C-alpha cells in the first residue's frame, strides 16, 4: 500500500459548529497524519480558482458564495491510501445518504453545507494540496 497525500477542507458550516477538533480526531484515529494546516477566509478569487473545474455548472455561484461565507480549515493529510480513507471518513456527498458515523452524517446539514471537502483522485490531490500549500509548508511525519 502506498503512502499518499490528500487535501481536506473543513467547510464554513463545520467551522461555525465548532467541530474542527472532532474532525481532526477522526483523521488521526484512522491513521492519517496532518502534515500541513491553516485556517483562512477564502476570497472569491481563491474559491473560484480552487473550484474552476465546476465553473460551467449551475451550482458554481452558490458553491463559491458558500465557501467564502466564513472561515475554512485546510489541511494536507498523509497516510496509507489517504485519498480513499479520507473519502470513507467523509461519507457520501449528500449527508442524508452518508453512513452513520461518517463526518457528513454527523456534522453536515445539507448537500450544499456538507461539512468537508476531500480530494477525489491522486491527480486532484496533487493539484489541490499545491493550491494551498508550498512544499516548505508541508511537514512530513512518520
UniProtKB/Swiss-Prot annotation:
Q: Which UniProt keywords apply?
A: ATP-binding, Cytoplasm, Kinase, Magnesium, Metal-binding, Nucleotide metabolism, Nucleotide-binding, Phosphoprotein, Transferase
Q: Which GO terms describe its cellular component?
A: cytoplasm
Report the SUPFAM superfamilies cross-referenced here. Nucleoside diphosphate kinase, NDK
Q: Which residues bind ATP?
A: 11, 59, 87, 93, 104, 114
Question: Which Gene Ontology BP terms does the record give?
Answer: CTP biosynthetic process; GTP biosynthetic process; UTP biosynthetic process
- What top-tier enzyme class does this entry carry? transferase
Which residues does the entry assign to the active site, renumbered to this chain?
A: 117 (pros-phosphohistidine intermediate)
Record localization: Cytoplasm
Q: Where does the UniProt entry say this protein principally localizes?
A: cytoplasm
Q: Which SMART domains match?
A: NDK
What reaction gets catalysed by this protein? a 2'-deoxyribonucleoside 5'-diphosphate + ATP = a 2'-deoxyribonucleoside 5'-triphosphate + ADP; a ribonucleoside 5'-diphosphate + ATP = a ribonucleoside 5'-triphosphate + ADP
Q: What is its EC number?
A: 2.7.4.6
Kindly list the cofactors needed: Mg(2+)
Instruction: Show the Pfam families listed in the entry.
Output: NDK
InterPro entries linked to this entry: NDK-like_dom, NDK-like_dom_sf, Nucleoside_diP_kinase
Any single GO molecular-function term of the entry would be: nucleoside diphosphate kinase activity
Signal sequence span is none
Q: What does this protein do?
A: Major role in the synthesis of nucleoside triphosphates other than ATP. The ATP gamma phosphate is transferred to the NDP beta phosphate via a ping-pong mechanism, using a phosphorylated active-site intermediate.
Entry-linked PANTHER family: NUCLEOSIDE DIPHOSPHATE KINASE (PTHR46161), NUCLEOSIDE DIPHOSPHATE KINASE DDB_G0292928-RELATED (PTHR46161:SF3)
> Subunit composition?
Homotetramer.
Q: Which family does it belong to?
A: Belongs to the NDK family.
Q: Which protein is depicted? A: Nucleoside diphosphate kinase
Tell me the organism.
Answer: Hahella chejuensis (strain KCTC 2396)
Taxonomic path: Bacteria, Pseudomonadati, Pseudomonadota, Gammaproteobacteria, Oceanospirillales
The gene is ndk
Amino acid at each position: 500500500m502506498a503512502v499518499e497525500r490528500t487535501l481536506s477542507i473543513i467547510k464554513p458550516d463545520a467551522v461555525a459548529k465548532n467541530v474542527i477538533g472532532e474532525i481532526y480526531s477522526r483523521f488521526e484515529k484512522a491513521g492519517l497524519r496532518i502534515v500541513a494546516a491553516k485556517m483562512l477566509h477564502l476570497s472569491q478569487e481563491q474559491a473560484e480558482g480552487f473550484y474552476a473545474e465546476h465553473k460551467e455548472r449551475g451550482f458554481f455561484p452558490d458553491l463559491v458564495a458558500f465557501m467564502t461565507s466564513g472561515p475554512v480549515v485546510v489541511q494536507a493529510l498523509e497516510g496509507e491510501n489517504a485519498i480513499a480513507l479520507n473519502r470513507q471518513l467523509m461519507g457520501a456527498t449528500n449527508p442524508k445518504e452518508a453512513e452513520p458515523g461518517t463526518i457528513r452524517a454527523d456534522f453536515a446539514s445539507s448537500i450544499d453545507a456538507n461539512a468537508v471537502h476531500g480530494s477525489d483522485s491522486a491527480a486532484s490531490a496533487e493539484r489541490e494540496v499545491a493550491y494551498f500549500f508550498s512544499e516548505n509548508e508541508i511537514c512530513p511525519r512518520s
